[in-house]
């Protein structure tokens, strides 16, 4: 942690020969944070995730399981639900990331509520910006309404899932989107983890 007169100023993390300075992460989140006491924890989590992403994209860390990246515009609804279902339904057999081409400040409250109905808590999640490294480190990239925002790398599997956008929608409108995402994620996991014959 980098501390200054105003408290925590940033985080410097090193791993696998890769360094990331997240001073900008704290500065970006601080004005929006309602509970600043936990801000260093959120920034540290994002730094760890970014370090692993960069290390895998550069081939410094071997992948143990298939990796999926879910991308939507705001990373506040569809991609968050898809990532959460992937974590839950795969039981750790798949590594998952989510990102947005223009991330929102927070997760959509109706999405958070709809996922709680499924026993999945998104309160610790935050919208993240789409990076080239995240795409490069992934085996499968699923986009949802973000057009051509994703860079294309050879050898990656790309799919675009046409789903309604839950932004500014109530829980009643979010539930069918959630259920369709769950169905698609279940099918994707089964396909990825199916033993080769």
Place the predicted regions along the sequence by residue.
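Amphipathic alpha-helical segments that form the core helices of the histone-fold
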Residues: 17-32, 44-48
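Short glycine-rich anion-binding loops that position phosphate/pyrophosphate groups of nucleotides
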Residues: 76, 146-149
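Phosphate-binding/catalytic loops
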Residues: 150-197
């Amino acid at each position: 942690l980098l501390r200054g007169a105003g408290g925590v100023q940033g985080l410097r993390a090193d791993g696998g020969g890769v360094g990331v300075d997240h001073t900008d992460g704290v500065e970006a989140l601080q004005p929006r944070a309602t509970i600043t006491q936990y801000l260093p924890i959120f920034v540290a989590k994002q730094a760890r995730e970014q370090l692993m992403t960069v290390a895998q994209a550069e081939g410094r860390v071997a992948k143990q399981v298939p990796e999926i990246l879910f991308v939507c515009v705001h990373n506040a609804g569809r991609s968050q639900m898809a990532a959460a279902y992937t974590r839950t339904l795969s039981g750790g057999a798949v590594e998952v990331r989510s990102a947005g081409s223009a991330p929102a400040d927070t997760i959509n409250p109706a999405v958070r509520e709809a996922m709680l109905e499924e026993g999945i808590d998104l309160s610790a999640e935050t919208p993240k910006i789409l990076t080239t490294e995240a795409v490069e480190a992934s085996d499968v990239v699923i986009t949802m309404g973000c057009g051509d925002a994703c860079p294309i790398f050879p050898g990656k599997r790309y799919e675009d899932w046409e789903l309604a956008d839950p932004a500014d929608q109530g829980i009643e409108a979010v539930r069918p989107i959630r259920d369709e995402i769950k169905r698609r994620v279940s099918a994707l996991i089964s396909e990825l983890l199916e033993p080769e014959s």
